[in-house]
Amino acid sequence: KNLPLIEEYNMKVAIENHCDLWSDEVIWMIEQIDHPLVGACLDTMNAQNMMEGIASCIDKMAPYTYCCHFCDTKIIVDPDGVHSYGCTLGEGSIDLIRVMNTLRREAPPELDTIDLEIEMPLSMYTLEVGREEEIKAMRKSIQYLHDVLDVGIRGR
């Protein structure tokens, strides 16, 4: 029903593996729609939160990925249970080198957006301290993307 509209504007649509959607479900929808402007939005944190297995999710979704929410997470076990929260790239539990290598090897040319997301547990900070921590994490993450994953423009 909406395909003519996305065709009119030549607008890509990426279906995300969100916190309630497995990679197989995303792929099924994309294959049912079967349109070159419809692909996947791969979220590395959601793959972990769904306990799907990050490597398996990346391998399945990479060939369909038009957009990636590139995140890292820390797993914390405490008396209240098991929790995950976003952190600076390279400081968490996700093998981001493998993720980037898989995307470089398997993703279609339509992959044109890698969105850096850091979902920090800001409730433990004041607003001012939380902003400072977010900026610090973002700067370190950009440095990680540049130095470790070879993302970005050289010489900057």
Give the location of each predicted region:
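Active-site acidic/histidine proton-transfer and metal-coordination neighborhood
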Residues: 1-39
